[in-house]
Swiss-Prot record:
Name this protein carries in UniProt: ATP synthase subunit a 1
InterPro entries in UniProt: ATP_synth_F0_asu, ATP_synth_F0_asu_AS, ATP_synth_F0_asu_bact/mt, F0_ATP_A_sf
Gene Ontology cellular-component annotations: plasma membrane; proton-transporting ATP synthase complex
CDD domains membership: ATP-synt_Fo_a_6
Compartment(s) where it occurs, according to its Swiss-Prot or TrEMBL record: Cell inner membrane
Phylogenetic classification of the source organism: Bacteria, Pseudomonadati, Pseudomonadota, Alphaproteobacteria, Hyphomicrobiales
Alphabetized UniProt keyword annotations: ATP synthesis, Cell inner membrane, Cell membrane, CF(0), Hydrogen ion transport, Ion transport, Membrane, Transmembrane, Transmembrane helix, Transport
Protein function: Key component of the proton channel; it plays a direct role in the translocation of protons across the membrane.
PROSITE patterns associated with the record: ATPASE_A
Amino acid sequence: MANDPIHQFQVSRWIPIDVGGVDLSFTNVSAFMVATVVVASGFLYLTSSGRGLIPTRLQSVSEMAYEFVATSLRDSAGSKGMKFFPFVFSLFMFVLVANFLGLFPYFYTVTSQIIVTFALAVLVIGTVIVYGFFKHGLGFLKLFVPSGVPGIIVPLVVAIEIISFLSRPISLSVRLFANMLAGHITLKVFAGFVVSLAALGPIGIGGAVLPLIMTVAITALEFLVAFLQAYVFTVLTCMYINDAVHPGH
């Protein structure tokens, strides 16, 4: 079981909770989502509480994250979109910290669960829909009628735009889930090769050198992927928010 690359994604009930036949158990996924929030909040608190004129390295990282989200949101949705900054920044930090924590031994990668990433994606699209109708009313539906489209093909274009819009939660969630899942499976497979070959003795240890090098390389790549997936998730979120702020553009 220890060498099973899928075992690391198993969901375990830590505190069984059943309410009216609905399973609301506190699981390992729940625990590590809480841990992600605590770590992200603690990091931001520690890095933003300093009063020194010269920022520390960690404070610089925190400021870079702030500037990245602020710039992405401003470039995508303009100044009117900045009201969503706390929401987008919270999403970015949650996904980023969750991805990074999952790379450490004995930590669970919560973003490798499709239900978690889908919930985040639905939260984004739900926010877009609610704000769009709240701010623009039926004018939000202009989003599905691009300007300059000949009247004869408007029904076809509207149908395509609606399908494209409704598929956003799926593409947004699957992209994050699939990348984290595939990367961790690959890493586990190569790490398993190292352990299995090393257990064979001197000859096996010699054969474990290449898988060990690959494991180190994949680990480094996974850190890059962890950041890139948080980056992509945030940029797409900013683009979707622009649809709520400026549906006719």
